[in-house]
Each structure stands twice: as C-alpha cells, then as structure tokens.
C-alpha cells in the first residue's frame, strides 16, 4: 500500500514537471508569434538631419537620432528608443536589443535581433545584412552612412549623432489606420482599400 502511494506521488511529481517544462517552452514561442503579428510601422514625421539624438524619449526629433522612430542615439551608437538602433552602452543590445528595438548584440552587432523592422546591426554598428529595414541603418560606429535610412530614419551616428534622416521620414503608403506602439505614431494601413482614420 505504501509503495502504491509512493508510486502515485512520483507520478504526480513527474506530471507537474512535464507541465512546467511545456509551459516554459510554449511561452517564448507565444511571445515570438505575438511580436511578429504586432510589428508596426511607425510614423516618424521628418527624417531629421544630424539630429544629435541622445536616445531616451525623443531626442533629435522623431526621424533623426534617438527617440521613438529614429537612429541609435545614446553613447557610441547605443541608445535605443522604440524604433531605432540597439540599446545599452556601446551598442549593446541589452534588454532592448532585437524585436521592435532594432540591432543588438555586442558593440552594435546585429545578433539575433539585428535587421528586420528594427534596424542596424553588423560590426560596430555597421548596417551589414541587417542594416536598413524600416527602423534605420547602421554604418561605422553607428553612423547612418549612405546605407543608413530605410523608412525609419538614419543610423546612430558617431557618439549618438542622429545620422542622415532616411527616406521620407517613414510615411505610410496608404495612411494611418490606428495607433502605433503604446499609442505613439501610427499603425500603417495594410492595404490600399483599408480606410485611414481621421487624425486630430
């Protein structure tokens, strides 16, 4: 009888462990799918010319350095913000690297999160394969360079300079059809027949 109850306890423990492992495996996948489904094109206003952005909450204007939409900002091309380069010190990705944020990895390397919608990457902030995209370019030590830009604005620039702006400041092809991430900017319309919202 004792061995039977001991067996039941072991079985219950194994079942609980299996549930924990399954939920741990499932969570990152769900988060990844949520991110992929929710990637938005920010509205950046003007591209910004050498915005001297210092990261944070909008330094250098929406399109230029730092802030939500633009390049790296911060110190040696780091910074971050929602749309720009990799966050942290000397371009380190830190928690903000990759995903919406942009480049990441060590000294501005793209790492897993480099490229895509976020922006730069490559060696010391070079655009590399991940440079450009919607978020913004890279260039040497975070410079926007000629390869910097895409829709989102220039790359980080040297010690946090905004870089060269980008092409058209990230205007939406068919207008805004909703709020952007955390109600900043906008969500671009996905199709030509989607009705843009009236913006105040």
Swiss-Prot record:
InterPro entries associated with the record: GRP
Signal in keyword set: yes
GO cellular component: extracellular region
Keywords, alphabetical: Cell wall, Cell wall biogenesis/degradation, Repeat, Secreted, Signal
First and last residue of the signal peptide: 1-24
GO biological process terms on file: cell wall organization
Induction: By wounding.
Main subcellular localisation: secreted
Pfam family, one: GRP
Annotated localization: Secreted, Cell wall
Role summary: Responsible for plasticity of the cell wall.
Entry's family note: Belongs to the GRP family.
Record-given protein name: Glycine-rich cell wall structural protein
Organism expressing this protein natively: Hordeum vulgare
Gene behind the chain: GRP
């Amino acid at each position: 009888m004792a061995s039977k109850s001991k067996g039941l306890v072991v079985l219950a423990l194994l079942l609980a462990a299996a549930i924990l492992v399954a939920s741990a495996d499932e969570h990152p996948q769900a988060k990844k799918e949520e991110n992929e489904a929710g990637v938005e094109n920010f509205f950046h206003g003007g591209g910004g010319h050498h915005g001297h952005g210092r990261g944070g909450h909008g330094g250098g204007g929406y399109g230029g350095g730092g802030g939500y939409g633009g390049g790296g900002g911060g110190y040696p091309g780091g910074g971050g913000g929602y749309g720009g380069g990799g966050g942290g010190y000397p371009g380190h990705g830190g928690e903000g690297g990759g995903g919406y944020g942009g480049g990441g990895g060590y000294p501005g390397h793209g790492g897993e999160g480099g490229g895509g919608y976020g922006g730069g990457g490559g060696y010391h902030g070079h655009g590399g394969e991940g440079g450009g995209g919607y978020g913004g370019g890279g260039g040497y030590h975070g410079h926007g360079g000629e390869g910097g830009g895409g829709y989102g604005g220039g790359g980080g620039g040297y010690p946090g300079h905004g870089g060269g702006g980008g092409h058209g400041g990230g205007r939406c092809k068919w207008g805004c059809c909703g709020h952007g991430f955390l109600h900043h900017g906008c969500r671009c319309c996905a199709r030509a027949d989607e009705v843009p919202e009236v913006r105040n």
